Amino acid sequence: WTPEFAQDLNAYHALDAEAELTSILSEYISLEIDLEILDMLMNAASAGTEVWSAVNNRSIVDDGANGTISDLGFYNSQGQWFQTLGTKIQKISNIIHQKTLRGGANFLVCSPTIGTILESIPGFAADSDGDAAKATYAFGVQKVGSLNGRYKVYKNPYMTTNRILLGFRGSQFLETGAVFAPYIPLI
């Protein structure tokens, strides 16, 4: 950043360089905090793990050290197979309900790869109608819609491709699974 750069940007594009740089830096700081919180949640998640394959009719049984892969032998479309992911999500949601005694999962965070599968499942409702003028853009995690009117779906481009984080967010502060409370906040 130089004074000349700021003057040129203002003269040619009518933009305030300081405001633009501050905005970008704020977004990056916000992204870092979001990723730190998501990492904390992924490491603390205790409802369990389910294994699922995107390959049609392929079952993976997680038996600890290594999974057993088997072909199921029934035939369906790829879209119908993608719907079986919903069963796995619901199973973990019910475990969360058992553990919290408050409710099942009501949000999920996934990678864009898993997001593509979820967006193709009947029951997914996108938050945007595709109008770029109405859309809001930011770095990192974005709410993209809901699944079956039950789960808010967030896409995280930095998330491991084959993982989904499910969580329950209650209506009160004490109904949360984690609290991010840094002793010295960023000024």
Regions found by a protein language model. Name each.
Residues S77-Q78, L101-N106, C110, E119:
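Conserved P-loop NTPase motor cores
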Residues W1-E4, N10-H13, A17-A19, S23, ...:
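Sequence/fold signature of self-assembling virion shell proteins
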Residues E27, G104-L108, Y151-K152, R163:
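Beta-sheet entry/capping signal
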Residues E50, V55-N56, N66-I69, Y75, ...:
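Compositionally biased, intrinsically disordered low-complexity regions
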Residues W1-P3, A14-K91:
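Alpha-helical scaffold segments that mediate packing/assembly in large oligomeric complexes
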Residues D34-L38, A105-F107, I117:
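Acidic/polar loop patches that form or flank catalytic/metal-binding clefts of enzymes
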Residues I96:
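Structured binding elements
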